[in-house]
Amino acid sequence: AVYDYYANDKITVLENLTREKLLKLKEVFSTMESFFHGKSSGLDPLNSYLSIPILINSKKDIKVTGIPSQERVGEGAVFLLDSGEVSTTAPMINIFMESMKKDGFRKMLNDKFIKYTNMCVEDFLNGDLSSLFQNTKKLSKVVFDNFKPMIPNKYHSLWQKGIANDSYFLKLCGSGGGGYILGFAKDFEKAK
């Protein structure tokens, strides 16, 4: 709303959203959000402003994408859990930045976290549900093992249970510490 009202040379979703326009919007939103959170990528407000899916390949490679239509009717679901806890971004970013000082953490980030995240995105965009659930399980385990301080304590056993019984897999939204947790279930009724 602030950008919509005050921006000069406003870029709208109705335009041809070139890479350059997306990067400009990302830069503007990064500056705006950094005022509240310290350091921000600008991706969350960009996505909210556009209200369309964007694919982020790297800091400088973002583009508008489509989400495949779901033709199959089944028991699976993507869902959100409200942790009921208010999260403050700065402490979570500090935990992450401290972890980044460790070689093992950086290696895990590149060799596992980024790898499985990218595989999940590809599986989702290609509509490959079998592979999506396999890779989401791997990602969920990597997150639990390496980002545990960012997962609200009351969700630790629930997180592990989903991985152990292969019924649902959880992923942090944003910086973690509270707020929402994204879930993927092969059979939503069983996951409940």
Residue ranges and their predicted role:
Residues 7-13, 19, 23, 27-39, ...:
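C-terminal nucleotide
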Residues 1-7:
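A generic, well-ordered mixed alpha/beta core segment in the N-terminal half of proteins
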